[in-house]
């Protein structure tokens, strides 16, 4: 049996999968993962290293830390899935992006221009303002902006439940009739992703750093 015949045989075993979408996904997965192994001429040692890497990724994952999502993020798969599902052909609109691991629903509703800082750790004061417009450039009044970021110490409130108030530097704001919003906050800072696990090891082995640029998350609805 040749490698190509083996691939065809495995795919044929999936032909009776009752769920049509599952059959489509698994057939494509088998075809592409076999093609990958053949393209790079995967050795038995490399195959086992990959198995052990995925095993460690699962072992370090718990209800707080999702190492598999971190792996997906660093491989660009998370962003690709977001683009496929939420991308727009309109060049004028703001691009969608992944939600990230620190989003918490039901943040407090805050007034126009109100501060969302509830924990003073010496951060640099900042004002975030702008306008929400539709694809035609008209202002969108009453749009909800669900906003969250890290504190000046580099951590999100959800990461420091014993130190920061749970709603520190997060809140829901609403645009006025002109589509304007204004938020008082502190300047966000760069922070590293968790690098003490297998994904961190992979980043180091491939010459990449673990730092994310300073940013503010805004979910508009």
Name each region found by the language model:
Residues 1-221:
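Beta-strand-dominated extracellular/periplasmic modules and repeats
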């Amino acid at each position: 049996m040749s490698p190509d015949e083996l691939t065809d045989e495995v795919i044929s075993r999936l032909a009776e999968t009752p769920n049509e979408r599952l059959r489509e996904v698994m057939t494509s997965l088998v075809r592409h993962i076999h093609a990958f192994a053949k393209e790079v001429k995967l050795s038995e040692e490399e195959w086992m290293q990959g198995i052990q890497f995925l095993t460690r990724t699962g072992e370090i994952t718990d209800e707080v830390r999702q190492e598999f999502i971190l792996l997906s993020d660093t491989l660009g798969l998370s962003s690709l899935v977001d683009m496929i599902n939420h991308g727009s052909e309109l060049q004028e609109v703001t691009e969608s992006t992944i939600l990230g691991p620190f989003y918490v629903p039901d943040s407090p509703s805050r007034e126009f221009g109100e501060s969302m800082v509830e924990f003073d750790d010496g951060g640099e004061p900042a004002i975030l303002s702008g306008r929400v417009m539709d694809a035609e450039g008209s202002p969108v009044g009453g749009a909800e902006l669900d906003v969250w970021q890290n504190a000046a110490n580099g951590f999100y409130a959800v990461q420091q439940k014993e130190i920061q108030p749970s709603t520190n530097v997060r809140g829901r704001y609403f645009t006025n009739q002109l589509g304007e919003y204004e938020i008082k906050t502190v300047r966000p800072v760069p922070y590293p992703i968790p690098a003490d696990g297998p994904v961190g090891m992979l980043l180091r082995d491939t010459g990449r750093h673990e730092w994310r640029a300073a940013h503010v998350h805004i979910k508009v609805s």
